[in-house]
Amino acid sequence: MAEHSTLGQNVPKSPAPPEGLFLMDGIEGLRSLPQHSVDMLLTDPPYGTTRNFWDVPLPLPELWEAVRWAVKPEGAVLFFAQCPYDKVLGASNLPMLRYEWVWYKSRCTGFLNARRAPLKRTENILVFYQKLPYYDPQFEQGKPYKKTADRGGNSPNYGKFVRSGGGSEDGLRFPGNLLTFPSVQRTVHPTQKPVELCEYFIKTYTRPGEVVADICAGSGTT
């Protein structure tokens, strides 16, 4: 990971934040909120892999303390991440780590290292929570199909199970964890994420009117 220094860069002065944003330390921002007032945390933290002055990883013990304070126990906590930072972040809270989404980008990154390593075409989104959160799967459209008849079985991984049958005329499929969204073409921040991707996650884990927090605003996509 990159050293925690500006490497000679001048730190620009931050402009006045627009209404709805708060210019402050993100962890302190979570701590300042009422306890368990956030339904979902969706943020793109610094990975610590570049020379940018702002690319300094958050202190993880303090981060998780603030997360447990502000986010409801049944709230989803989603962090964008990429190797090697995703490994560090996931291992920092294994009791809350549940699974990951993978964003398949339309544009690769890492061209300066193309002769030493494969181009980076994906980024991970790690999902943490204490208790099972609200989950509204965003179904994908496919060809109509017929479900299998009711039957049971015994899996070495999961034990006994019963598979319910029935028919389907609409062809809707449950989503897999690989999501394809186009990269942002004209960015205002070097690591800007697509609005559509963030919207997908917000629809998946929250109901209308619930509170979503982002402690690393960047371009303000969330």
Predicted regions and their residues:
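Core catalytic lobe of class I
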Residues: A2-T222
